[in-house]
Every structure is written in structure tokens, then in C-alpha cells.
Amino acid sequence: MTGRKIIHIDMDAFYASVEQRDNPALRGKPIAVGHAEERGVVAAASYEARRFGVRSAMSSLKAKRLCPQLIFIPGRMEVYKSVSRQIHEIFHEYTDVIEPISLDEAFLDVTENKPGIPLAVDIAKEIKRKVRERLNLVASAGISYNKFLAKIASDYRKPDGLCTIHPAQALDFVARLPIESFWGVGPVTAKKMHTLGIHNGEQLRMQSLEMLTREFGKVGTVYYDFARGIDIRPVEAVRIRKSVGCEHTLEKDISKRSSVIIELYHAAVELVGRLEHANFRGNTLTLKIKFHDFSQITRSVTQSKELTALDVILPLAKQLLREVDYEHHPIRLIGLSVSNPREESDEKGVWEQLSFEFSDWELDE
């Protein structure tokens, strides 16, 4: 599959950049798109804010502690959607094989493209130039022969990045990657990798498939392939999203109510950030609990109104938690998801830690 030409386009600090573009007084200042009140969540942060450690899906209180001079700007989702449509108009000048990941991020398959341009990097350069000239915004682009490598490449030189990973370079490139840079490797998984002596892509590639699946379950197969630069997933032009969710694997099993509530709060904060960034609307909240013995349960509640705000989602999550006997069965994983019940005939895949929906990339980068 090394004959494919895949581009990953990622708008740099999209929501915040749109606000700074439209209001020159905000340029060069640390800003966060979101609400500053106690239960607020950062939906996006400018690069000036990121230098202080402010990140998407962070609670507004924590963001303000990290950066006291942080300026909060209410989100304008309709504006972001309009700008996203303009960006996609540029994409369609080159290909119709476009897989949107969120308003500010997409994969493009330009193996066969409308202008007949032979080099994908030249298409990426043109897209970046047109985005800057027409919209006064900055995009990063990664080019490779599969989606995993294209995504890694777009992250490599942000902001305003352009990076190509050729087939002959892939193994060396992946070998140098810190294990934390692999998609699907969060803090808990990274810590476990470190205890196994795995700190980078080269050390990951040295592990057998048997060992990785034994230690990490079926996602071990994904790690095995990624370490070898393998990703056979096609760019899918139609991508219907049925849910938005997040999971937190805990560093140690917990059964104390106060500890469980704290972890539930963190999951709810992250979920609200993901919902806002993905512009997703649903009215069913699902709580997933995995216990110390790896057994798991899910509990759901459906409301007549859409679930988007933390002060709505968190009380519902606590309500669902009351149905869980965690005092006698310690918890090792907590997950929350919002979905549309009309589309929930099949939940398979929604709660896999790696669902291949790029859920870990859908916060504003």
C-alpha cells in the first residue's frame, strides 16, 4: 500500500486563530476559546496560551491558574463551521476523497487528483498557500503513504508545518518517535510501556506480536503495525459519526467515592471539550466502567434535550454512577460517551480504547 498519496491537513489552533484573525487586538496574546466560569472548559488555546501549559479540554480554573493573564473568548461555532466549509472548498479543488476528522482536520487521498499534480507535497504546498491567502489562517500538512504516518508528519513541525515521510524513510522516522507520540498511547499506556523498557518506536518494533497482545490486548496488534509504518485504513469520503466519548484508564484501581467522583469529573470535562470541538449533538449519555477483574458494564440515560454542557452532563454521570457497586468491585477504567439514540442500534466499537475514529486527535491542536 506504499503507492498511496495521503495528506493530513490540520489547522493550527483553529478556533483561537479565527478569533485572533477577526479581532486584531487579540493577536499575540494568550487566549482560550471557552467560558471562564467555575465549570467552564477550554475548547481551544492559542499558541501563546500553550506556552503556559494551557490545553484543550482543560478546566477553565486550571487554565487560569497556569496563565493568569489568559483571555477567554466565547466560542462562535457557526463562524468556525463557515470557515471550515471554505477550507473544504479548497480541498475539493484537488480531490473529492476527503475524510473530515473535525472542523479543522482532514485526510485527503490525492493518489489521483483533479489537476493531475504528480507530487503530493506540491498539492500540500498549494493548499497551505491558498488557506493563508484566502482565509488568513495557517495550516500544517503531513504527507505519506498511509494515514498514521501522514498524521504523525503533520504534527512534526507545527505550527505552519510541512513534512513528508517517504516509504524509504518510514522505519527510521518511526524508530525515533517517543512512545508518547504514537496515537492511542496515553499517559497510563506510556507508563506501562516504560516499565516494559519501551520508550520509542525502535524499542516498540523489537517486541513480538505475542508480547504486545498479551500486555495490551487486541490494540497490541495496532502498536505492532504502527511500529512498522503499517496502516491499511483507507481515506473514507463519507464518515458518519455516531458518538463522541473518552476513556480514562486509572493508574491504580479505586473504590473510594471521593476518588471516583474526581475521576468522573475529569472525564466529563474532557467529554465536554470533545463535544464542542467536534460540534456534536446527542441526547444519550453512557457511562462505562471497567473493574479490576476486567469485567465491565455500561449504563445509559436519554434526555429530551441535547447534552453539551458540563453542568448537565456531570449530574447525569453521577446519577448513572449510583447504579455501580464499585465499593466491592474497584474501578480501573471510567468512560463517558454522548450519542444519538436513533443511531445507537449497534454500540460495537464505540467503547474500544482504540476505535480508529481518531478520537484522541479531535481536540484542537
Predicted regions and their residues:
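Gly/Gly-Pro- and Ser/Thr-rich, intrinsically disordered tail segments characteristic of DNA damage-repair
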Residues: M1-E215, T221, V338, R342-D346, ...
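DNA-contacting surface of Y-family translesion DNA polymerases
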Residues: H8, S181, T189-I331, N340-D364
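Short Gly/Ser/Thr- and Asp/Glu-enriched loop/turn motifs at secondary-structure junctions
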Residues: I101-E105, S144-K147, F280-T284, H329-L333
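Residues at or immediately flanking beta-strands
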Residues: V138-S140, T286, L333-G335
